[in-house]
A protein has these predicted regions:
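Macrodomain-like recognition of ADP-ribose-binding/processing modules
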Residues: 2-162
Length: 162
């Protein structure tokens, strides 16, 4: 999953250390072209909590799921929007009959969502979806930014017996 901005065209800061920049850089220019076409057809910026899909191109993945997470403000709406991102991606993966999905730690970088809170939301959404709605997904991977993020996810996953 690519955590992206509302333009969905990749990070516009050269050399920026965000997941959006990394994915667009390594996947290739075709991703930006595809996303530009999708966004031109849509005619407006992408709101939080939805998902668009492109080919993975040069990445070792068939598809890239692009979603806009919330910029953290401390409001309850942030949590709802973050959950919507995860549920939208899970539903789309299931609809596409994919058996696995990889999530980054959405909104916890430059968007400022506290990792403790964000990881609980991510794990709760995945756990709920797999138990209640899932038809095809067999593997979910959380790809995190740092060792401390890893420890936070690991600790919080124990609450769900993972």
């Amino acid at each position: 999953m690519n955590a992206c901005n509302s333009q969905m065209l990749g990070c516009f800061v050269p050399g920026h250390h965000c997941i959006d920049n990394a994915i667009h850089s390594f996947a290739g220019l075709q991703v930006r072209r595809d996303m530009l076409e999708i966004m031109n057809k849509q005619g407006h910026e992408e709101p939080n909590g939805q998902v668009k899909v492109s080919s993975g191109y040069n990445l070792p993945a068939k598809y890239i799921f692009h979603t806009v997470g919330p910029i953290y403000s401390g409001m309850h709406r942030d949590e709802t929007d973050l959950a919507s991102c995860y549920y939208s991606c899970l539903r789309k993966a299931d609809e596409m009959k994919l058996d696995s999905i990889v999530f980054c730690s959405l909104s916890t970088g430059i968007f400022g969502f506290p990792i403790e809170k964000a990881s609980r939301i991510a794990i709760k959404c995945v756990n709920s979806y797999l138990k209640e709605e899932n038809k095809n997904i067999k593997k979910v991977i959380f790809d995190v930014f740092s060792d401390s993020d890893y420890e936070t996810y690991r600790k919080n996953m124990k609450e769900f017996n993972y």
